[in-house]
Amino acid sequence: FLFSDEPEETIDEIEHGTWKVLIVDDEPEVHAVTKLALSDFEFQNKRLEFISAYSGAEAKELIKEHPDAAIVLLDVVMETDDAGLQVAKFIREEAKNNHIRIILRTGQPGQAPERQVIINYDINDYKSKTELTAQKLFTVIMSSLRSYRDIISIEQSREGLEKIIIASRDIFSAHSIEHFIEG
């Protein structure tokens, strides 16, 4: 059955694509260190593609341009004390993107209390920059990509089931009309 005109991803695209990781931080060194620490990272035959934003405003634009980003590593304090939180709010409420995994990184943990932030902003993880070693960064990226992959898989399955239900309804409706006409 052909249910949609949308092109299907080929096996080659799935196996050889990249995982988009948006790095949002006003410190260029954080971008450089993150890219270096994850330079050889690979998950399911895909490498990471880094997209850098240095402000909340720039991050919002990049979220619009890359709705398929898997992860955002998000600093809290940039041009304002809550710029990162505003980006998180934008991602979930305005962009309506519940797929992307948001990892909040802060150099000032007291600025945004972890418990409140996780609850109020639909953040997936919260890390202090000082505790985020290369190994911990690897771990959080790996677990976030697994979550993202599973969310996308569930969403695709749900969409497939919706198409089957619609097609079944159409087939049943056509069969019922034929049966009615035949008397």
Report the location of each language-model feature.
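Conserved sequence signature across two-component system core domains
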Residues: 24-25, 53, 59, 72
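Short hydrophobic/Thr-rich beta-strand motif most characteristic of the beta2 strand and flanking loop
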Residues: 42-57, 62
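Active-site beta3 strand of CheY-like receiver
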Residues: 66-78
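Hydrophobic/aromatic residues positioned on beta-strands within the core alpha/beta folds
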Residues: 103-106, 129
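Short amphipathic alpha-helix used as the core "switch/output" element in two-component signaling
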Residues: 39-40, 58-62, 77, 82-101, ...
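Receiver (REC) domain switch/output surface
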Residues: 120, 136-149
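Signal-transmission linkers at sensory-effector interfaces
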Residues: 23, 150-173, 177
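Non-catalytic signal-transmission and effector/linker regions of two-component phosphorelay proteins
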Residues: 1-22, 29-49, 68
